[in-house]
Amino acid sequence: MGTARFLRAVLLLSVLLMVTFPALLSAEHHDGRVDICRLPSDSGECSRFFGMWYFDGTTCTKFVYGGYGGNDNRFPTEKACMKRCAKA
């Protein structure tokens, strides 16, 4: 029973890595810098409710930010988001 549970955990971890790793790679520039505009929205770890904006690959979209943590694809206004992430 313990071996089956361990193998299930390894399989789950493998699937999570296969799904997550390409997304992280696609956010990197060739020189190793992360393009914050390609990161997914991340509401953070707290339970506050701040209206913020993130770039979804096409346009800026409003989301609720918890106030702590998350990533840098987070802007206080739609204008700031578009200025940083929208390509001319």
UniProtKB/Swiss-Prot annotation:
A single GO cellular-component term on record: extracellular space
Pro-sequence residue ranges: 28-33
Tissues in which the UniProt entry reports expression: Expressed by the venom gland.
Role, per record: Serine protease inhibitor that inhibits trypsin at a molar ratio of 1:1.
Disulfide feature: 37-85, 60-81
Site feature location: May bind Kv1.x/KCNA: 39
Listed Pfam families: Kunitz_BPTI
Protein location: Secreted
Keyword field: Disulfide bond, Protease inhibitor, Secreted, Serine protease inhibitor, Signal
Span of the signal peptide: 1-27
Protein name: Kunitz-type U15-theraphotoxin-Hhn1d
Domain BPTI/Kunitz inhibitor: 37-85
Principal place of residence: secreted
One GO BP: envenomation resulting in negative regulation of voltage-gated potassium channel activity in another organism
GO molecular function: potassium channel regulator activity; serine-type endopeptidase inhibitor activity; toxin activity
Protein family per UniProt: Belongs to the venom Kunitz-type family. 03 (sub-Kunitz) subfamily.
InterPro entries, per the entry: Kunitz_BPTI, Kunitz_BPTI_sf, TFPI/VKTCI-like
